[in-house]
Amino acid sequence: MSETAPFEGLPTTPRADELLDKAFSRAARAGRAKSGKEAQESMLLTAGNILSDNLRNVVTSWPDMDALAPFHRDLADAVVGVDDLRQQLSEVNWASRQVGDLRKDYQGRMRRADAETAKKLRKQAFARFADVVEEVEGDLLAIGEARDELRTLPDIRPDEPAIVVAGYPNVGKTSFINRVTNARNEIASYPFTTTELHVGHLERDYVRYQLIDTPGLLDRPAEERNDIERQAVSALTHLADAVLFLVDASGECGYPLDAQLDLRDDLRDRFREVSVVTVCNKSDRSVDVDADFFMSVETGENVDEVLDAVIGAIDHEPDLPFEER
């Protein structure tokens, strides 16, 4: 399972009825190969092992949430609720152990029984297996839904420096990322919104940087975000090594300059551990704003200088392959 996409390899979560059908049909085949009490014991062991193993596999296929990078853990919490997921996995783990205990109990009782009694015991065991699995039917469904949601999370590398590009819509964020990364960027969707995440990459002095545009999250005031989106913004604070905030002083973006600067100030408060670099884009049209840098993505003016500045604002020491250890 990848550290950059910890949920990508999660297997499909079986439903309760699928597990029971699989276990009982294979048990029937196993029983046909033998006769008398041996057939009943074979059916018991086959069904019990399949159910116990498959339920346990549901649990062990998931990564340890506490061992995840903070970005992935917080984003997962925003999407599915980590505490709820832990409880659901705990219930399925209980079911796995319960089936295993029932199998051992009925196996011991069968050994002391005749063939007819063994058949009755096997039927009792199957009924109790079904009761246990059906008790976690809702948990299995919830885990399956969580798996489907989390597999679509963006492939972000917490070990690579990340520059979050923020600002209101139409200020030139995507154009900037496309220009400095030669348009080699990826698009992924947040599962809890209709929003897409744009990620570009570039290398500088042996270091690979991620440039991340988050439309729908960091392009509007905090009060317009819902609870889940606020949690996602919180997750991004763990990821960002610098924030590049673009403003458009020309007014062409459709948003007042005061509103743009208010959003900048809000992000400064949220991302207080990293540098927030304010850049006026479309400087060929207007520079009527107090900014750290001025550039025009359209003409290319000062784009390289802005990129150098935001990279320089990142406190990152590369682990060079030729360094002495």
Predicted regions and their residues:
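Charged, amphipathic alpha-helical linker segments immediately N-terminal to NTP-binding catalytic cores
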Residues: 89-142, 312
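Canonical P-loop GTPase G-domain recognition
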Residues: 273-277, 282-325
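Pre-Walker A adenine-sensing motif
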Residues: 145-156
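Switch I (effector-binding) loop of TRAFAC-class P-loop GTPase G-domains
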Residues: 156-158, 179-210, 214-234, 257
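P-loop (Walker A) phosphate-binding loop of NTP-binding proteins
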Residues: 166-169, 179
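Conserved lysine of the Walker
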Residues: 173
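N-terminal accessory targeting/assembly segments
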Residues: 1-92
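Inter-motif core of Ras-like GTPase G domains
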Residues: 224-251, 262-271
